[in-house]
Amino acid sequence: MRRLPVYLLLDTSGSMAGEPIEAVKNGVQVMISSLRNDPQAVETAYLSIITFDSDARQTVPLTDLASFQMPDLIATGTTSLGEALKVLSNCIRTEVTKTTAEVKGDWKPLVFIMTDGQPTDDWQSGLNEFKNVRVGTVVACAAGSGADTSVLKQITDSVVSLETDQESIKSFFKWVSASIGVSSTKVGESGTEVTGLNQMPPPPAELNIVV
């Protein structure tokens, strides 16, 4: 069974405390509930969560939707985006099955990054490591006015921005859910992968595409 790995990188730094982190928790839960009602996603999508603040860690390893359990997210500390990219690169290398002459490996991972601030570590060394792993579509979300879209643009061409209120964050995760749904249908029905924002559902009004 070829899996569609999905990695969520979530900023849990101190500036996300209060409404934003609660909105992220709710958003992820709504996303999981929605995906569990999509037979194609249930069959192919596997989800992992990596959180980053003063350091970064994989909070949920790559897990099928039925077994996924929501971790407790606590907002504290600084913004180690570079470390998160290193953790992500390592997870992709160890968890995603590569295609060989004998076996068809997993589909290329989808990656969604959400951050509300400037990186406080050496993010470029993390980016260099990330560039050495094979991924599918990568979407970075700049939450609130403090996020640095110029940094995110160096990670991926697909950057969106939104406010950090409950409604906007909820809309983002609904859109992520729809995007995973479209991706899992595409690989299931036609054996092709989504290659960018233009093949995903149109973003809701709360999301602005950063050009």
What are the language-model segments listed below?
Residues 28-36, 87-97, 127:
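Short, well-ordered amphipathic alpha-helices
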Residues 4, 107-108, 134-137, 156-157:
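Short glycine-/polar-rich loops that comprise or flank the Walker A/P-loop
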Residues 22, 99, 117-155:
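VWA/integrin I-like adhesion module and closely mimicked acidic/polar interface patches used
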Residues 59-67:
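Short, flexible, mixed-charge acidic loops at enzyme active sites
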Residues 156-203:
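C-terminal helix of von Willebrand factor
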Residues 1-60, 69-107, 110-114, 137-152, 162, 166-175:
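Von Willebrand factor
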Residues 13, 31, 126-131, 192:
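Mixed-charge (Asp/Glu-Lys/Arg
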